Amino acid sequence: MGDHDVALCHVSRYNHANYWAFVPLPTVSDDTGCDSLHHDSASERIRMAPPASASKAGAAEERLHPYERRLLDQYQIHLQPANRNPLSRADSAAGREETAQTPAQVQMVPVVAVADSTSDQHASVASSQDLVDLFFLEGSQAVDGLCFSPYPIYGWRTAEERRAAVCEVFKTYNVVTRLPASPAALAAAQRRYSRHRHSAIAPINKSAIETREQYWRRLSNLYTQKGVKDAASAADAAATTATNGAVPAAPAYEPEDPFYIIDLGRVVEQMARWRHELPMVRPYFAVKSNPQPAVLEVLSALGAGFDCASKEEIHMVLGRQLVASPDDIIFANPCKQLGDLREAQACGVTYVTVDNPLEMEKISRLMPSAHAIIRIKTNDSKAQCSFSTKFGAPLEDVEGLLEAARQFNVTVCGVSFHVGSGNDDQSAYVSAVRDAYQVFQQAVQYGFKCTILDIGGGFPGTEVVEGSGNTSFEAIARTIRPVLAELFGGGDVTIISEPGRYFTAASHALLMNVFASRTLRLSDVEVSRQAFQSVVSMDEPEEYQYYVNDGLYHSFNCILFDHAHPTLLLLNDGDGADGVESGTEAAAVCSEEEGETSLSGPLANDPLFMSAWDRRRSFARRPLRITTIFGPTCDSMDCILKKQPFPEMKLGDWLLVPDMGSYTTAAAGFFNGFATRRLEWVSSVDLCARPRPVYTREGNTLRCVSE
């Protein structure tokens, strides 16, 4: 199927747990020249209030491309002007201008009525691609620079410049946006098209939509095969070089080396989702979570600021020219080393977080131009990673901090908090915002006018599994929007945040190879316990130990430092999840089946569907064994799975680990000389807002014939 290249974003868009509605079906045409079929998705809409500038918005909508107009109509989005006047503040440093901007163009909460705090929110966007298309449409020339909310777009770039900047990053890192479609997906699309071509009612099975796991599995198979081919090509080139008498260069990597597949499109999608859910809050990406240059460059292009914890991170951001000015950086380490303070002063960084009087004294001596943001303690008892034991001033200590700031002549300009990472208690966010408001009032009594609210980070970046009890980002956003509007909706407060894992967690998938194994006899006690649990096959009462080429000293440091629980998936484990079959056979098997429902109106995006053959492979899964998995180093503590049920593996098997994009590579070392160096760049979304592609039938397959 290599000749059937279909845009990846139109083939592998996955169904997010929080976006159940189906995405639009791509336009399909006969090679005989029949009329194309257009379908729009159907879902409940949420009406917005009329735009403030109806005449200008109406004129802009009249000039919109039909596809763009359909997007706005589909999600009930109205164009409106935004408050683009940046907040001015007095700067106490000698020799500088009287007034300066707050973190470059960070949007302010305008004066709006807060009777209905959700009235300015749009309907949930069903498609990842639609989210991205809407993000780049907002503020563009196509809509006369108008916004979809009362808040200006992030950063200093225009909409067109943002898109061009992201495209340039993709070009620099050779990001692959086109991959072959799976035979099952194209066969399923062909069958539904031919069968229901003239009908508005078609059977749709939600369970057939390609999930994020299936997406990663499909890419994993492609790139493991690519590694073998690249290694063979390198060997041929080395042989040719040796024949000519030159010393052959060492290969970039071996075919069995571990590697990352990095989906930069997911980062773009997450920014689009953030803008949709929290348009009043500008994100300052936590560099510590993933300092990969490509990730930083994409986020810079999208208008993010940066949360830096050290002078090295400040140098990284400024050296790569990722910000318009140092005011796009917040030095968010409450306890800073003296050298870092000196360097921040030299670099022109202004905004720093503080949580104790000694820090106020240090800042007054070493960073006199700083504007302090008081970090307060929050209730993070239900967080996966809590920080209040180390950072944050209790509310009863805030007055002492304000007194110290006045004593040492340090300007206090705002309040920050962090409720911890993975905090499922939504009330913690509300309480923290209200506590911050209380500090705003206290600051006035000491002669300080606070104009910045930093709501921290820790927002979830992965899909919420139904029944897990975890809280989605959308649910958190719905919780904090009303309280932000109620307490900080007066127009004189800049609201920022410090998300890290939110942007990158789901953007990386790790592939690692099994390079050794052995078995150990289980003790009688362990045999009895495992037999009682009836979990694993006890025909061979042994512990199976495997060795893989990434471990605790490298990507899996997140187990120790981030309290993470990575998911290990065995590729080609015999359950059909990775199976590939002929298009004809798949189409034949994908017939009437249980669970199909008839939906009137729009069809789902056919290339998203996996065939019934994919889900009904008769191969039995490999037997479950008591399994321990070690990393590659000589340390016996390098263990990522210990005596747990796992499918039996063999030498050369690949393990897929999704959601490995935050606090993994950032803290990875080179212990014993091991490292994961190979990176493969892809994008699951397209950057071009345009109609869906047109497909034509050729026998039993579909071919993309237009962009």
Swiss-Prot record:
Inhibited by antizyme (AZ) in response to polyamine levels. AZ inhibits the assembly of the functional homodimer by binding to ODC monomers and targeting them for ubiquitin-independent proteolytic destruction by the 26S proteasome. Inhibited by 1-amino-oxy-3-aminopropane (APA, an isosteric analog of putrescine). Irreversibly inhibited by alpha-difluoromethylornithine (DFMO, a curative agent of West African sleeping sickness). Substrate binds at F561, D562, D635. The modification N6-(pyridoxal phosphate)lysine is found at K288. The record marks H418 as: Stacks against the aromatic ring of pyridoxal phosphate and stabilizes reaction intermediates. SUPFAM superfamilies: Alanine racemase C-terminal domain-like, PLP-binding barrel. CDD domains: PLPDE_III_ODC. Pyridoxal 5'-phosphate binds at S421, G458, E498, P499, G500, R501, Y663. PROSITE patterns: ODR_DC_2_1, ODR_DC_2_2. Keywords: Decarboxylase, Lyase, Polyamine biosynthesis, Pyridoxal phosphate. This is Ornithine decarboxylase. Its EC number is 4.1.1.17. The keyword RNA-binding does not apply. GO terms for cellular component: cytoplasm. GO terms for molecular function: ornithine decarboxylase activity. One of its GO terms (biological process) is putrescine biosynthetic process from arginine, via ornithine. It comes from Leishmania donovani.
